[in-house]
UniProtKB/Swiss-Prot annotation:
GO biological process: translation
Record flagged with keyword Lyase: no
Cellular component aspect of the GO annotation: chloroplast; small ribosomal subunit
Name used for this protein in its record: Small ribosomal subunit protein uS12c
HAMAP family: Ribosomal_uS12_B
Record's keyword terms, sorted: Chloroplast, Plastid, Ribonucleoprotein, Ribosomal protein, RNA-binding, rRNA-binding
Biological role stated in the UniProt entry: With S4 and S5 plays an important role in translational accuracy. Located at the interface of the 30S and 50S subunits.
Subcellular location per the Swiss-Prot or TrEMBL entry: Plastid, Chloroplast
GO MF term set: rRNA binding; structural constituent of ribosome
Source organism of this protein record: Mesostigma viride (Green alga)
NCBIfam families hit by this protein: rpsL_bact
Amino acid sequence: MPTIQQLIRSERKRVYNKTKSPALKACPQRRGVCTRVYTTTPKKPNSALRKVARVRLTSGFEVTAYIPGIGHNLQEHSVVLIRGGRVKDLPGVRYHIIRGILDTAGVKDRAQSRSKYGVKRS
């Protein structure tokens, strides 16, 4: 604990917390346009072809976002909504695309966890 003299000499430093999703600019979601849709491979112990998209956001950032679920209809120039949330085994992917809104279709034949994949009750 600092002495009074130490506090007079230099004030307490304020601790700022750094955001994990800076491209959202403190908003819950952001709209963007896909500039590239492609697959990439995950980090070491895992093996797959993960579907990702490079998205140019309304905030001016260009980010890599993960496309969740089985199958998608995204292509270049698709308008998407993204949210925060990283993908642990894909370095540099810190955002998720929200399914079932704007140009992104919901997951076909999805029965469980439907709200997470933009599927209406059948």
